[in-house]
Amino acid sequence: MKLTRAQFLKALPAAALVLAGCAAAPTAPADTDELVFDHAYPLDYATQFTADCYADGSTLLTIPDAQAKFLVRPEGAATLRTVPDGVTVLQQPVQNIYLVSTSAMDLFLHLDALDSIALSGTRAEGWYLDEAKQAMQSGRIAYAGKYSAPDYERILTAECGLAVENTMIYHTPEVKEQLERFGIPVLVERSSYESSPLARMEWIKLYGILLGKEALAEEVFTQQAQRIAPLLEQ
C-alpha cells in the first residue's frame, strides 16, 4: 500500500508528530528512530514535488506522480530502525550520481555540483553544455549507457549513490527495477511537467536538498526569478 503524505507523517515512529518552530536549533544526531516534523519547505511555483523538513535535519522529498518518496538524511545521522513502506532513504553526501536526465545537468552546474556526478546517460558529443562535455572528455564523468541500456557493471563499480532519470525510463520499467534490485535508488525527474519556466527552475531546490546546498539553491532561484519574471509579464 502506498502512503499519502498525511499518512506518512502519521506512520512515522514518533511518540508524537508535532509542529515545531521553523527555526529549531540543530542538535547532535541521537540514537533514535524518532522523526519530529518541523515545517513544510516553501515552494512558490513547483507542483511536481513537495518537501517536508524534520527537526533533525532530514527532509522528505515526495514526487507524487512518480509515486516516490525520498528521505534525505544529514551526514552522520543515526540509522533509522524503522522506515515506512515506499520510502527510500538517501544518506548525505549523495555521491557518484548516474545522471540520465539531461535537463537536470544545468541545475547541477548552477549548484557547483558537477563533482557529485560520476556517470552520464549521454555521450560527451551529445552534451550541449560545455562543462558536462569537458568533464566527460577529461574522464571525470564516464558514460554508463542510455536509459534503456545502462552499463550495470560500470554503475556498480562506481558505487553509484543515485540514478536521476527522466520519464523515458517508464518505457523500460525493467531497467528501473534492476537498478533498485542492485540497491541503487532511482529518482524520476519531472520538472518538464511543470506549467511554467519558474516552476521548472524551482526544481533546483530539490537538488539543493539532495546535495546539502539548500542556501545556494535558494540564492540561485531568487536571482533567476528576478531575471525571468519581468520577461514573463510582457
Regions found by a protein language model. Name each.
Residues 4, 22-105, 216-234:
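Bacterial Sec-exported substrate-binding components of ABC uptake systems
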Residues 5-9:
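N-terminal export leaders
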Residues 57-156, 162-168:
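A short, structured surface patch at a secondary-structure boundary
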Residues 96, 153, 157-234:
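Extracytoplasmic substrate-binding proteins
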